[in-house]
A protein has these predicted regions:
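Short, well-ordered beta-to-alpha junction loops that form the rim of enzyme active sites
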Residues: 35-37, 106, 143
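Aromatic-rich peripheral "rim/lid" segments of glycoside hydrolase catalytic domains that contact
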Residues: 3, 7, 21, 78, ...
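Active-site mouth of glycoside hydrolases
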Residues: 1-6, 35-39
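Short, surface-exposed recognition loops or helix-turn segments adjacent to catalytic cores
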Residues: 27-36, 169
Length: 174
């Protein structure tokens, strides 16, 4: 029920019902439609064209950007490609839907903290300067998670260098 690939009209109806329920309780809330694969413009076009066709509403588009998962899923071949495609997708989505966007999930292998810091710095800078100010922010998904979840940003109950990218605002300082 409500699977976009099987019945877009029903999926859009469920999305609209959620939107209406939120607005009935808190009219000023921003309703975000969030998808994974932020570097995959076809996925976003499919969903948002379907939502638009069936008149579903949203206030913001949320993207997940994980180089690890994008490479695993063969959406990209490198971290650089993930970053380039994600920023291009953000700009395309803005041009198409004129809706603010946010990177609502990202993460990096905490066993590679310096590489993670560098990637997050680049992502922050790209979102800030290459996305024409349409990207309203970035959330690191479960940074405190460690052990079973490799894409957290903590080791031994302490933040790794990955989190320094947020403290430094993506300035690419070493």
């Amino acid at each position: 029920m409500g699977r976009a690939t099987e019945n877009m009209e029903q999926y859009a109806g469920l999305t609209q019902a959620g939107y209406d329920a939120v607005k009935a309780v808190y009219p000023d809330a921003l309703c975000i439609v969030h998808l994974d694969g932020g570097c995959d413009p076809k996925r976003y076009q499919f969903i948002f064209e379907g939502l638009r066709k069936y008149h579903a509403k949203w206030d913001m588009i949320g993207l997940s950007i994980y180089p690890y998962w994008d490479i695993e899923a063969k959406l990209t071949q490198s971290e650089d490609e993930t970053l380039e495609k994600a920023i291009a997708n953000i700009n395309h989505l803005w041009e198409t839907y004129h809706t603010p966007l946010m990177i609502v999930e990202t993460g990096y292998d905490a066993d590679r903290p310096e590489d993670g810091k560098q990637f997050m710095s680049r992502l922050i800078q790209a979102a800030r300067h290459q996305a024409d100010r349409h990207c309203k922010g970035i959330f690191y998904w479960a940074p405190e998670a460690e052990g079973h979840y490799r894409l957290g940003a903590f080791r031994n109950h302490r933040p790794t260098a990955i989190m320094d990218a947020f403290k430094e605002g993506g300035s690419n300082k070493n």
